[in-house]
Curated annotation (Swiss-Prot):
One of its GO terms (molecular function) is S-adenosylmethionine-dependent methyltransferase activity. This is Ribosomal RNA large subunit methyltransferase M. Coiled coil: none annotated. The active site is at residue 306. Belongs to the class I-like SAM-binding methyltransferase superfamily. RNA methyltransferase RlmE family. RlmM subfamily.
């Protein structure tokens, strides 16, 4: 199996292809990307027959920016007979996957695929039963075994394959299903909520998103991102010349500072989180984030970089490289992750976590 399917945001296939070609090449896994505009997916075809599995096991999925999900596949199954689509799919997967822990029947995230998704939901139950009978799936779901993927690109036309549960997105189609809270000031709140799900392991939430932490929201108006921090019982300094939603001010947890986010300097030294979603050139935002991290003004940050119309992968890569260079130059040990989230549009979201030596049981205490 020498092909890897990467799901992405429609319109960002070229960026996804450029990224996987670059990062696979650095690991000496060579191939070429098949790109169809606005398809919502890319196929990276490796030159060597076993390199598909090698790629999805060796390259950390968390290092990819534009891919929502990935899995290795074989040849395209076409003209599946409407009276029995199951038998050919089972036949393709037998001998390829043994005792998979989960089945996902998926489509690309496009308007054209919405009707197809209804079929996928109905088709999943009988297909799962058949794959269990054939030994392709275990009789129960388990995160310890590979995930079996059946990816429909058209009616009667699909790829079959698998991903590794420890190196993929845990979400169906790579999209966390989040509900917009009716009391949130803006829909942008879902960006930060999704970022927390993607970047922070669930078992670390109580420690890293703890009650009573201090946080700063730069460019906060009207308070979509502040809302997420308040919901987690943090004390928030919301920095913006524009007004904050009254519902947030009424909580008593928010201090509104009428200042420019680029000029604000914190007067506390125990700020755990700084978040930032400002409409500004990515280089300017990255320089500000580097300043906060180098000076130790916060422990973790999540921020958005607005993308230009062209060379978007190059722009993001350049800014992340600059940030890493600044941290290295000042001896700051940190983890950097970036992802174009489902709720992002022409932007990517970056998470940086400063790391200190462990003291007294805390993972990152100063």
């Amino acid at each position: 199996m020498n092909k890897v399917v990467l799901l992405c945001r429609p319109g960002f296939e070229k960026e996804c292809a450029a990224e996987i070609t670059d990062k696979a090449g650095k690991r000496e896994i060579f191939g070429f990307a098949r790109v169809k505009e606005n398809a919502g997916y890319v196929i990276y075809e490796c030159y060597q027959p076993e390199d598909g599995e090698k790629l999805i096991s060796e390259l950390p999925f968390s290092s990819l920016i534009f891919a929502r999900q990935w899995f290795v596949v074989g040849e395209l199954l076409q003209h599946l007979p409407p009276e029995d689509r199951i038998t050919p799919i089972v036949g393709m997967l037998q001998g390829v996957v043994e005792k998979g822990g989960e089945l996902r029947v998926e489509v690309a995230d496009t308007n054209e695929s919405k009707e197809l998704m209804k079929f996928c939901r109905k088709f999943t139950v009988p297909l799962r039963a058949a794959l269990r009978d054939a030994g392709v799936l275990t009789n129960y779901e388990t995160p310890k075994r590979p995930v079996v993927h059946v990816f429909f690109i058209a009616p009667g036309c699909c790829y079959t394959g698998y991903s590794f549960a420890h190196n993929n997105s845990p979400f169906y189609m790579g999209i966390p299903r989040l509900k917009f809270p009716s009391d949130a000031p803006s829909r942008s709140t879902l960006k930060l909520e999704e970022a927390l799900h993607v970047f922070i392991p669930e078992d670390e939430w109580d420690e890293r998103l703890a009650n009573g932490m201090y946080a700063v929201d730069l460019g906060a108006c009207p308070g979509g991102w502040t809302y997420q921090l308040v919901k987690r019982n943090m004390w928030v300094y919301s920095v913006d010349n524009g007004p904050m939603a009254q519902s947030l001010m009424d909580t008593g947890q928010v201090t509104w500072l009428r200042e420019d986010g680029f000029r604000y300097r914190p007067n506390r030294n125990n700020i755990s989180w700084m978040v930032c979603d400002m409409v500004e050139k990515p280089a300017k935002v990255t320089a500000l984030m580097a300043q906060w991290l180098v000076n130790g003004w916060c422990r973790e940050t999540i921020f958005n970089l607005k993308l230009p119309m062209k060379k978007r992968y190059e722009e993001v890569s350049h800014n992340l490289a600059y940030l890493q260079a600044q941290l290295d130059e000042h001896g700051v040990n940190a983890q950097i992750q970036a992802r174009q989230l489902y709720h992002d549009r022409e932007e990517v979201t970056v998470h940086v976590r400063r790391l200190w030596a462990a003291v007294g049981g805390r993972r990152d205490e100063r």
